[in-house]
Amino acid sequence: CYFCNSIESIQKEYMEQLSHIFSIGHGSKDIKELILELQSFDIEFLVDIRSKPYSKFYTHFNQGFLKYSVEEYHIKYGYMGDLLGGLPLDRTCYTDGKVDYNKLKNREFFIEGLKRLQNANSKGFNVCILCSESNPKECHRAKLIGVELQKMGIELRHIIGIEKEKTQNQVIFELTNGDGLNTIFGEEHFTSRKKYI
């Protein structure tokens, strides 16, 4: 209907005006699919936030090959997994073997990583952070980085296909079954899905 298309057009225009950074997960995609998705959003910088920038099963996402591949398509590559990775070396960031995002968000190295993203965003660069999980609700991109960026006035927009995205609010809504970040107990307490130590 005309009215529906009009509302969608207004929403899209509004979304484009907000301060934002993109996120993407490589999952089991091939490298060309990832590049096409990045190109569909005019990404200029791909920031790898994987703590371990390699893949045992999808070797085309190992750091060296990934860097070479995206730069061949004029997308600059940078690594910040040491600052923003979901598996920090700092063992005090873990509770019962799981990464505790309430602890991690207060570490100096993590705050430094957020400041670097904020700086790139303030300069108008079209940045996308990359991690392994293709579904953003299974990754610290949404449960930690997106939440903290939102507090800084920056929306994380999750690329889920060519010209397809989900907002941070949509992902949190799905993640919390519609309860949002605030529950009757206060702010949602997210951790990693698995135990690592």
Which residue stretches match the model-derived regions?
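Residues lining hydrophobic/aromatic ligand-binding pockets adjacent to catalytic sites
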Residues: 3-6, 10-197
